[in-house]
Amino acid sequence: MLNEFIAIRRELHQIPETGYKELKTQAYLLDYISKLPSEHLEVKKWRTGILVLVKGTNPEKTIGYRTDIDALPITEETGLPFASKHPGNMHACGHDLHMSIALGVLTHFASKPAKDNLLFVFQPAEEGPGGAKPIMESAEFAEWRPDSIYGLHIAPEYKVGEIAIKPGLLFANTSELFISFKGKGGHAAYPHLANDMVVAASAFVGQMQTIISRNIDPMDSAVITIGRIHGGEIQNVIAETAYLDGTIRTLSPETMEIVWTRLKQLAKGWEEAYQCEVEFHPGSDYYQVDNDPVETEAFIHFLEEQYPESYVPARSAMTGEDFGYFLSEIKGFMFWLGVDSEYSLHHAKLSPKEEAIPFAIDVLIHFLESK
């Protein structure tokens, strides 16, 4: 018999929606939650997200658990019988698993409340433009603000049954990068009468990598990746405009500031050298996921006692996650949940092993009961 929460995952997988458009997802979650025992539950909507408070039997504090609910603008290529029914959208980062796990834990505590209050945060827009910071600033969250908060993220590189975590920095600071170049277009045969923005932008791609190699401490780490470049409209016309879209990843806020300062300095030089206008356009910025050492060590001890084969020491990763905003103000941690997939996060063929769902539910129930 198919596990109930694996079945839920498959239903959620078919209705992927991007940030702040998670209307079907929200409706699905609300419908499920409405069927749970309601004696100890309070439910609030926040935009396309949901907050659920499970009132404790003798509460002295509130413990938070957060899951993200949005999907990515990726065309699915898994070939699964329960593949996305929303063309161009896919749960390619495991948020369908995240939600089903959260529902599994919530279902348990709705029937068997813990001593303390539990707050379940179903957060929209993790993939962009970022939902963690605005939901934290909301009146709805403020009323039920937890004293600690936890979360997980699937990890294709770990086996089912493995949990990877470390105290301190787990995920990097991330900043989306959108740059436009505006020059002077013209006929392809007369480059001397134009300012070619394809040339300017492509040269900028290479030059910005010197920031990493020459401006960042070799004992530190940072990444600038350009994932999309667009310039011009037709093959025999010199491009008047060009655009670079990418991301910056650093292991500290200070290093992020260095990268941005140098990018802007380079841009000023580019304007002079290529006789163009260079403009940076706003994108999402995500704060590092910095696990509280005391909370994390307590969880590691819990795993070693209760799930001795599961704990794997993690390394810091350049992955970005806006859960970092929660941890910047509230003690807690995030961990990697192994799902053993040959394809990476954000890949059109990502197919996590679903056995990770009941395993994670079991771990989280026992951990939260121990708090």
UniProtKB/Swiss-Prot annotation:
Enzyme Commission number(s) from the entry: 3.5.1.47
The UniProt record lists the keyword Amino-acid biosynthesis: yes
Active-site annotation: 68, 127 (proton acceptor)
Gene3D superfamilies given in the database record: 3.30.70.360, Zn peptidases (3.40.630.10)
One Pfam family per UniProt: M20_dimer
Pathway(s) of this molecule: Amino-acid biosynthesis; L-lysine biosynthesis via DAP pathway; LL-2,6-diaminopimelate from (S)-tetrahydrodipicolinate (acetylase route): step 3/3
InterPro entries: AcetylDAP_deacetylase, Amidohydrolase, Bact_exopeptidase_dim_dom, Peptidase_M20, Peptidase_M20_dimer
Coiled-coil region list: none
First-tier enzyme category under EC: hydrolase
Keywords associated with the record: Amino-acid biosynthesis, Diaminopimelate biosynthesis, Hydrolase, Lysine biosynthesis
Similarity comment text for this entry: Belongs to the peptidase M20A family. N-acetyldiaminopimelate deacetylase subfamily.
NCBIfam families given in the database record: amidohydrolases
Protein name per UniProt: N-acetyldiaminopimelate deacetylase
